[in-house]
UniProtKB/Swiss-Prot annotation:
It comes from Streptococcus agalactiae serotype V (strain ATCC BAA-611 / 2603 V/R). Part of the Sec protein translocase complex. Interacts with the SecYEG preprotein conducting channel. Has a central role in coupling the hydrolysis of ATP to the transfer of proteins into and across the cell membrane, serving as an ATP-driven molecular motor driving the stepwise translocation of polypeptide chains across the membrane. It is found in: Cell membrane; Cytoplasm. Its EC number is 7.4.2.8. GO terms for biological process: intracellular protein transmembrane transport; protein import; protein targeting; protein transport by the Sec complex. ATP binds at Q84, G102, E103, G104, K105, T106, D496. Its main location: membrane. Monomer and homodimer. Part of the essential Sec protein translocation apparatus which comprises SecA, SecYEG and auxiliary proteins SecDF. Other proteins may also be involved. HAMAP family: SecA (MF_01382). It catalyses: ATP + H2O + cellular proteinSide 1 = ADP + phosphate + cellular proteinSide 2. This is Protein translocase subunit SecA 2. The keyword Membrane applies.
Amino acid sequence: MIAFNSLFSLDKKRLKKLQRTLNTINSLKGQMATLSNEELQAKTTEFRKRLVNGETLDDICAEAFAVVREADERVLGLFPYDVQVIGGLVLHQGNTAEMKTGEGKTLTATMPLYLNALEGKGAMLLTNNSYLAIRDAEEMGKVYRFLGLSVGVGVSDNEEEDRDAATKRAVYSSDIVYSTSSALGFDYLIDNLASSKSQKYMPKLHYAIVDEADAVLLDMAQTPLVISGSPRVQSNLYKIADELILSFEEQVDYYFDKERQEVWIKNQGVREAERYFRIPHFYKQSNRELVRHLNLSLKAHKLFERGKDYVVDDGEIKLLDATNGRVLEGTKLQGGVHQAIEQKEHLNVTPESRAMASITYQNLFRMFTKLAGMTGTGKTAEKEFIEVYDMEVVRIPTNSPVRRIDYPDKIYTTLPEKIHATIEFVKQVHDTGQPILLVAGSVRMSELFSELLLLSGIPHSLLNAQSAVKEAQMIAEAGQKGAVTVATNMAGRGTDIKLGKGVSELGGLAVIGTERMKSQRMDLQLRGRSGRQGDIGFSQFFVSFEDDLMIESGPKWAQDYFRKNRDKVNPEKPKALGQRRFQKLFQQTQEASDGKGESARSQTIEFDSSVQLQREYVYRERNALINGESGHFSPRQIIDTVISSFIAYLDGEVEKEELIFEVNRFIFDNMSYNLQGISKEMSLEEIKNYLFKIADEILREKHNLLGDSFGDFERTAALKAIDEAWIEEVDYLQQLRTVATARQTAQRNPVFEYHKEAYKSYNIMKKEIREQTFRNLLLSEVSFNENGDLQIYFI
């Protein structure tokens, strides 16, 4: 029986309900154990028949869980604990299970994945990296295959492998798929760039379990997945803008608020720019690109910090994941920011590419019929999980009591004091032989602590974005006697740290944090590296008034206190501030930081709603064309719409003496180069009929030439128009968001401004699709090559 004493009252009620189902599952244990392998495997077919006959997943849940539990033991030698069954039930219900480090989330997922896969609509488990997806699919896949289900892996251990549509279709048609969140997102975007049925592979998104759910669904929610296409014309303004920004004086030429992460050019800076470039009006339309590049350069210098937001590796800017400090391979900032950072670091500026398609994790995962999550730290963000994803967070009891001691923070006035105190504490703990995990907030700070430990003669390993290739080995050794591992917060998630021989007697793993992170969940993840599965251990954080958290989110009185007392301390004789108000201060500041993060993610949802509506519309129309269904961009309808719109334009806006020129121009630009002209005496109705006649003749001629391939031609003409317009729209909306955010400084609501402009652009895009489809149908040249393949040349 599970003890509920330590849980929130709401969790008590939830868990009591789940306890009844657990009791039923436990009562089936003996029955399942008596079944032969063949009889146990036959249960899968039985369950599927029962679902077809009208039973629901909830009806068969207890029995299905009991089957998987028995299969887990027979195949893996692992029998899920009661707490793991409870976690599996939470996942089946479409909620997030908060399970502490080492509690066996991988095994827990086998039960809800099996159950939900029985419907034949697909079930996915999405991990943080390819290694985990491949490993878990291989290990847990043995259980699913034993029970007659197919298993696919959406990633490859060969990064160079380029999977074709047929391979991906085979993966996604599997009963259960293991992949990563990013791989799924990019596959979704690529699938919606397909031009034929044979190139499509993605099923409807049905059920998914997201590992490290808070990191993916919350912390990474603002990071868009972007497929880039053809490059923009390379700009030489990055270098010029960078030179001017370097000469600017903070708070004189530009305003910078580190707390709010806002920066913009002030009036004095505008005057300096006008003098520098010898232009009379800085914000004139013709100077738009110059203004854009200056703002990009300003952002690069003030909002992006080397060693914290990115590293320079082999002449390239590599972004760091804010949630775990890992390098985001293959990821670039959009809208020119990446190029501005390259210029700031005096690297070769890479071409700025257009965004062909993009989607945020929020919108990707909200497309699933049922979504569940697993994490070690989700409870503090339950309100946001409910509001954004309609997912409750249920804290699952640990199988063994948590024996880790979390000590109150040691608080210092200045950064040098804190660093000195931290190193002295590390020396004391190291002398006992107790293993230490020392966690810094950035690559730069981790390297500083590493240098200080070297000077102190303490051997250690350094784990950060620059040394991530050795991560698994370092983590495996971090729990050994006498080990000291210096790491960024990338050590907070991933492989468990197992204690070496004799370490428990020394007190277990010591986790030493050198600053509070921006989110309480990150701190909880770091603390959770110690005390795994009932192990002994402790955590201790060292903080100061100069930490990023306090600078960016601290109250004014704290900043005043620092200015008043910073010169009164001796860094070599650090003095901890023991008053209760300071402990409360750092706790409240972190809560404020969490609130800002939630607010920023909420704004991302508001911004992205316009893009999501447009994306759904475009993808729906594309799929209708590919599947041969009637949609808004049916070629036949477009001919009528475009010609009718042109006649309405002639009737309302064109003088009679300009009529012939306008009609001839329309024919030449959109329909045919064989211009025969029209008579002055023709009425608008006659002109309309004349244009329809030209269109019908051109299409009849192409139909006669292409025969059965004419439908393919029509579809290709419309798809090409949609794709060209959508690429322009995605790119424009990215630029628009940057501009709209900047308008906040002019006392305007950035979201309102964005939606207003996005709606205008949306209508322009639809008009452009119709007109370009019209041109593609009529002005294109078609033929067959010597192999009999259809060739289309669009003008």
